[in-house]
Amino acid sequence: MPTINQLIRNTRQSIRNVKKSPALQGCPQRRGICTRVYTINPKKPNSATRKVARVRLTSGFEITAYIPGIGHNSQEHSSVLVRGGRVPDLPGVKYHIVRGTLDAVGVKDRQQGRSKYGVKKPKKKK
């Protein structure tokens, strides 16, 4: 417990909340250009090859973003839209690429959860 003199000398520091996606600078999404598209392996106990892209944002930040869904057409110099949201088993990946916008096409033959993967409602067959 500090004395009154100690409190006068230096006041209590308020706890600052840490932003989870600082590269977006308060925006819901940001546009960027892919500088590298590659795969990485997740942490234990998971096993896979997750597709990620290194993206240079319009805000000037260089970030690593996850490419969700099965199959993608993203390559170097692709223009992509990036949203926040981390991938729990990939260290350092705090952003997702939005499918179905700009150069990132939606997931092919997706029937359920289509809005998250940029897929239009399929035509009904008679």
Swiss-Prot record:
It comes from Jasminum nudiflorum (Winter jasmine). Residues 117-126 have a biased composition (Basic residues). The lineage of its organism: Eukaryota, Viridiplantae, Streptophyta, Embryophyta, Tracheophyta. GO terms for biological process: translation. Pfam families: Ribosom_S12_S23 (PF00164). Part of the 30S ribosomal subunit. With S4 and S5 plays an important role in translational accuracy. Located at the interface of the 30S and 50S subunits. GO terms for cellular component: chloroplast; small ribosomal subunit. The keyword Transferase does not apply. The keyword Ribonucleoprotein applies. Keywords: Chloroplast, Plastid, Ribonucleoprotein, Ribosomal protein, RNA-binding, rRNA-binding. This is Small ribosomal subunit protein uS12cz/uS12cy. Coiled coil: none annotated. It is found in: Plastid, Chloroplast. One of its GO terms (molecular function) is rRNA binding. Belongs to the universal ribosomal protein uS12 family. Transmembrane segments: none annotated. Residues 106-126 are annotated as: Disordered. PANTHER family: 30S RIBOSOMAL PROTEIN S12 FAMILY MEMBER.
